[in-house]
């Protein structure tokens, strides 16, 4: 039961990105997405959450053209994903999928991060050029030093997303468990090929930020894929269906950039000047 042991360890050691105990709380403090426990109040709910209010490297952000810098030293994302066991989990404030040992790794700036889980937010947390999308997928990886790397994909309403189509029956079962009163249900998925989740990209954005839920720790390397993917409206509702009403819209508002640098990778040396705020000088 390695997958179940890993889930327990994750619940114990990581209150990140809504990996929280069963009642959507950390350190015994309930947090939410509106009202007295909403994002604007997170920093005042518990001393351990103070960074949510005073941190200067908070996430998510709105990635604006004028703030983007093309970095020719960045490399394409190197990800190695494999077959592994998986479990779908209702985390009260989001739907997540935990992976067993050996799920894969991502290498960012010569640092290795191991794939732990993925989860969805509806609507998207990050905005791209002022646009908020229908959903956002977070692939969560952790390094040996405890820091995190999250690879995020934005989704617009359109054609069905193939991986979610495969998970339809499991998501329906997760919803049925909630209706029975089990608000922290777990549904065994079995062995899956995590390579089916990976998507190649010719462009991405990178910046240093934080967890998007309490305690909002500022130890996350964010990679936002430049290509916006599609999922159907029905799939968006399917992701929301296992959650209580107060968590169906589970996106934290965008946070100030505070002078941070948002870098862009593009596999072409020539970058459209409309995409970036730093224009290259013409040669003499």
From Swiss-Prot:
Pfam families: Carb_anhydrase (PF00194). Residues 244-284 are annotated as: Disordered. Residues 244-253 have a biased composition (Polar residues). Belongs to the alpha-class carbonic anhydrase family. Substrate binds at residues 212-213. Residues 29-266 form the Alpha-carbonic anhydrase domain. The keyword Membrane does not apply. This is Alpha carbonic anhydrase 1, chloroplastic.
């Amino acid at each position: 039961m390695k997958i179940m042991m890993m889930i327990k360890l994750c619940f114990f050691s990581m209150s990140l990105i809504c990996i929280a105990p069963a009642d959507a709380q950390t350190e015994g403090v309930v947090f939410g997405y509106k009202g007295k426990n909403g994002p604007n109040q997170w920093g005042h709910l518990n001393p351990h959450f103070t960074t949510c209010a005073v941190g200067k490297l908070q996430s998510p952000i709105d990635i604006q053209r004028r703030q983007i810098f093309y970095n020719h030293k960045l490399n394409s994302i190197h990800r190695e994903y494999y077959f592994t066991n998986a479990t779908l989990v209702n985390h009260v404030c989001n739907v997540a999928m935990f992976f067993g040992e050996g799920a894969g790794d991502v290498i960012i700036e010569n640092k290795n991060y191991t794939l732990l889980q993925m989860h969805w937010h509806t609507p998207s947390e990050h905005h791209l050029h002022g646009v908020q999308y229908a959903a956002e997928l977070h692939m969560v990886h952790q390094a040996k030093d405890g820091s995190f790397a999250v690879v995020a994909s934005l989704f617009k309403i359109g054609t069905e997303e193939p991986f979610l189509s495969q998970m339809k029956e499991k998501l329906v079962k997760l919803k049925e468990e909630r209706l029975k009163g089990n608000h922290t249900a777990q549904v065994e998925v079995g062995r899956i090929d995590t390579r089916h989740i990976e998507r190649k990209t010719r462009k991405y954005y990178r910046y240093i930020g934080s967890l998007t839920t309490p305690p909002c720790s500022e130890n996350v390397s964010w990679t936002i894929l430049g290509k916006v993917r599609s999922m159907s409206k029905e799939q968006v509702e399917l992701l929301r269906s296992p959650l209580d009403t107060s968590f169906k819209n589970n996106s934290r508002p965008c946070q100030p950039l505070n002078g941070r640098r948002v870098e862009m990778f593009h596999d072409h040396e020539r970058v459209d000047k409309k995409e970036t705020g730093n224009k290259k000088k013409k040669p003499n």
